A protein has these predicted regions:
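Conserved MFS/SLC helix-loop-helix module at the cytosolic interface between two early adjacent transmembrane helices
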Residues: 60-95
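Helix-loop-helix hairpin linking two adjacent transmembrane segments in secondary transporters
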Residues: 137-185
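Helix-to-loop junctions at the C-terminal end of transmembrane segments
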Residues: 61-73, 260-273
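Juxtamembrane intracellular "pre-TM" segments in multi-pass secondary transporters
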Residues: 2-5, 185-214, 397
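Extracytoplasmic gate region of multi-pass secondary transporters
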Residues: 29-30, 210-251, 257-258
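A late C-terminal transmembrane helix in Major Facilitator Superfamily
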Residues: 326-360, 367
C-alpha cells in the first residue's frame, strides 16, 4: 500500500471528467429535442426517451453496480468509462433513431457504475482529510457535464446540425475515458484490501438509521432538482418567459451549484457544520420553490434559482461524504443506494409535477411541500464529529455480515 499523500488528485480529476461525460451524453438531446425529432424523423416524445431511460435503468442497475465496485473496483470503473465512451461513438453509427437509442442505452448502463463510485474513488485515492474535497470535485464534474450539455446543444446542434454535436461529444467522451484508464493503472491506497461486502450488504446498510436518513435526503433533493430541470420551461411559459430565458435560468442554477460544490463541502466537513447546512438547504429548496411560483418578475426568479443552485447542489457531495464515512469498505454499494434513492425521487417528483404542469403555482407549491419532508431528516444528519460511533457500528455490522457468509460457505 503506498503512502497517503496528494498524488491521487490526477485520478480524481480524470474520474470527474468521466462523470461529466456521462451527464453530457445523458442530456445530449434535451436542449435540441425539436431539431433531434426532425433529424431522426420521430416525435418529440420519442426523443424524450433518449434521456428518460437513464433513471429507469439506474433504479434497476444501481445495487449490482455498487456490489461490482466493492468487489472489483478498478476493472469495473474502467469498464464503466469505456462503455460511456463507446456509447458516444455508437450514436455515430447512422442517422436513425435506433443508433441513437443504442448509444444512449450503453451510456445508461455505464452511468450507475461511474457515478456510484464517487465515494469509493475518493476513499481509495485520497487521505481522509481530503476526501470531502475529492467527492466535491467529482460532483462538480457531474454538474459541469450537465452545464456543457445545455451549452453545446444549442451552440453546435442548432439548425439540425445534430451530427456535428454528436461528433464533438463522442471525442470528449473518448478523451475522458482515456484519461481515467491512464490514471487507474496505479492502484489506490486501499487497492490491496478486499472489501468485506457480500449479498447482505444492502440489508445491513439499510438497517442503519443514518443510511435511511441519507437516502431520504437524496430522494427529496434529487426529486426537486430533477423536477425543476424537467419542467421549469413549461411552468414559466404561462408567465410569458421564453424557452431561451428559462434555459438561461437553468444554466444559472447549475453554474451557481458548481461554484458551491467547489467551496462549501470541504469547509463544512472541517467545521462539522453539515447538519446546519442541510437544514438550510432543505429550507432554501422549500422557500425557493414557493418563491418561483409567487414571483412574477424574471429578475426575481433568476435570483431565487441562483441561490437555490448555490445551496442545493452542494448538498449532494455533503451527502456522499457522509455516506463514505458510514459505509467503510462498502462505499460502492452505499453510494449506489444513495443514487438509486435520488433517481427514484426524480421519477416520483417529476411525475407529481407533470400532473400539475398546467397549474404552475400548484406545481411549485408541490415541490415546496416535498422539500419540507426533508426537515426532520436534516435534523438527524450526521456531522463528521457525531457520526464516529455509528461508523464503528456500521463497519462491525458489515464485517459480521461478510463473516457470516464466509462461515456458511465452510
Amino acid at each position: 500500500m503506498r503512502s497517503r499523500d496528494s498524488s491521487g488528485w490526477p485520478t480524481i480529476a480524470a474520474f470527474a471528467s468521466v462523470c461529466a461525460g456521462t451527464q453530457l451524453l445523458w442530456l445530449t438531446y434535451a436542449p435540441v429535442d425539436t431539431g433531434t425529432a426532425h433529424y431522426y424523423g420521430v416525435s418529440v416524445s420519442a426523443v424524450g426517451w433518449l434521456a428518460e431511460i437513464f433513471p429507469l435503468l439506474y433504479v434497476v442497475l444501481a445495487i449490482p453496480a455498487g456490489r461490482l465496485l466493492d468487489t472489483h473496483f478498478r476493472p469495473a470503473l474502467l469498464a464503466g468509462g469505456a462503455l460511456m465512451a463507446a456509447g458516444g461513438v455508437l450514436r455515430l453509427g447512422g442517422q436513425t433513431f435506433a443508433w441513437a437509442m443504442a448509444g444512449q442505452l450503453a451510456v445508461a448502463v455505464a452511468q450507475p457504475v461511474v457515478v456510484s463510485a464517487m465515494g469509493k474513488v475518493s476513499a481509495d485515492y485520497l487521505p481522509v482529510d481530503r476526501r470531502a474535497a475529492g467527492i466535491a470535485v467529482a460532483s462538480a464534474g457531474s454538474f459541469a457535464g450537465m452545464l456543457l450539455a445545455l451549452i453545446l446543444g444549442p451552440t453546435l446542434g442548432a439548425h439540425g446540425q445534430i451530427e456535428r454535436l454528436l461528433v464533438v461529444q463522442a471525442v470528449l467522451g473518448v478523451l475522458a475515458a482515456g484519461a481515467l484508464a491512464l490514471t487507474l493503472r496505479r492502484p489506490g491506497y486501499e487497492g490491496d484490501e478486499s472489501a468485506a461486502v457480500e449479498g447482505g450488504a444492502v440489508r445491513t446498510l439499510w438497517a442503519l438509521p443514518t443510511m435511511r436518513t441519507l437516502c431520504g435526503l437524496a430522494f427529496v433533493g434529487f426529486g426537486v432538482f430533477v423536477a425543476l430541470a424537467t419542467w421549469l420551461q413549461t411552468l414559466l411559459s404561462p408567465a410569458g418567459i421564453s424557452e431561451q430565458s428559462a434555459g438561461v435560468l437553468l444554466v444559472a442554477m447549475v453554474v451557481a451549484g458548481i461554484a458551491g460544490c467547489a467551496v462549501l463541502p470541504p469547509l463544512l466537513a472541517r467545521r462539522g457544520a453539515e447538519r446546519t447546512f442541510m437544514r438550510g438547504a432543505v429550507l432554501t429548496s422549500a422557500f425557493g420553490c414557493a418563491a418561483l411560483g409567487a414571483f412574477t418578475m424574471l429578475g426575481a426568479r433568476a435570483g431565487v434559482i441562483a441561490v437555490m443552485g448555490l445551496v442545493m447542489l452542494p448538498a449532494l457531495p455533503v451527502i456522499l461524504t457522509a455516506t463514505e464515512r458510514l459505509a467503510g469498505s462498502a462505499e460502492g454499494t452505499a453510494g449506489a443506494m444513495i443514487w438509486m434513492a435520488g433517481n427514484l425521487g426524480g421519477l416520483v417528483v417529476a411525475l407529481i409535477v407533470q400532473v400539475l404542469v398546467h397549474e404552475p403555482l400548484a406545481a411549485f407549491l408541490a415541490m415546496a411541500a416535498v422539500s419540507l419532508l426533508g426537515v426532520p431528516l436534516a435534523a438527524r444528519f450526521p456531522s463528521a464529529r457525531s457520526a464516529e460511533g455509528e461508523v464503528a457500528v456500521g463497519g462491525a455490522m458489515l464485517a459480521g455480515s461478510a463473516s457470516g457468509v464466509a462461515g456458511n460457505e465452510d
